[in-house]
């Protein structure tokens, strides 16, 4: 998986999951992308990443918990691994979801919480913290939305896809 980011200079960047970590490239000119840095990680065919502010958060089915990457110097060609955040036995994750409106990321298909939805606070972006979980069913993928109007105004709702078991809606976090 991959996500885009814009540096302070206005140049465009992509952060992409690779077999052994995450690659970062400048894509300001999409016909001439330039690899600028990479962050090593576990060997896995499945790496997922989300960008929130000046940080990228990577997960993998190979382990390492949440890889926290500082993108503040990306314009200078540097991406720094802040930490491999592990908590409560968390190591592997299938998917990571972000909600920029709330400042939370969510883990799906992790090795803890029965593979359910895990809420992670980014109050301190360099040190994400697990603050809740829904472990009734495995969650393969999700979309989390903060409603601004209507009957759900001010609420963060998670649409959780449980594979062949259907779709479940949750109040989050």
Map each language-model feature to its residues.
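Feature marking well-ordered beta-strand scaffolds used for ligand recognition
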Residues: 1-173
């Amino acid at each position: 998986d991959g996500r885009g980011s814009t540096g302070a200079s206005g140049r465009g960047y992509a952060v992409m999951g690779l077999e052994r970590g995450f690659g970062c490239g400048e894509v300001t000119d999409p016909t001439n992308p330039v690899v600028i840095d990479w962050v090593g990680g576990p060997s896995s065919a499945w790496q997922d990443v989300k960008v929130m502010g000046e940080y990228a958060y990577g997960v993998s089915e190979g382990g390492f918990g949440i890889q926290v990457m500082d993108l503040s110097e990306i314009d200078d060609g540097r991406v720094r691994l802040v930490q491999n955040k592990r908590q409560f036995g968390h190591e592997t994750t299938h998917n990571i979801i972000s909600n920029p409106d709330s400042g939370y990321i969510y883990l799906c298909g992790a090795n803890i919480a029965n593979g359910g939805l895990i809420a992670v606070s980014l109050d301190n972006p360099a040190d994400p913290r697990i603050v809740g979980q829904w472990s009734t069913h495995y969650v393969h993928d999700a979309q989390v939305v903060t409603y601004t109007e209507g009957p759900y105004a001010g609420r963060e709702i998670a649409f959780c896809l449980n594979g062949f078991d259907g779709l479940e809606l949750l109040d989050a976090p």
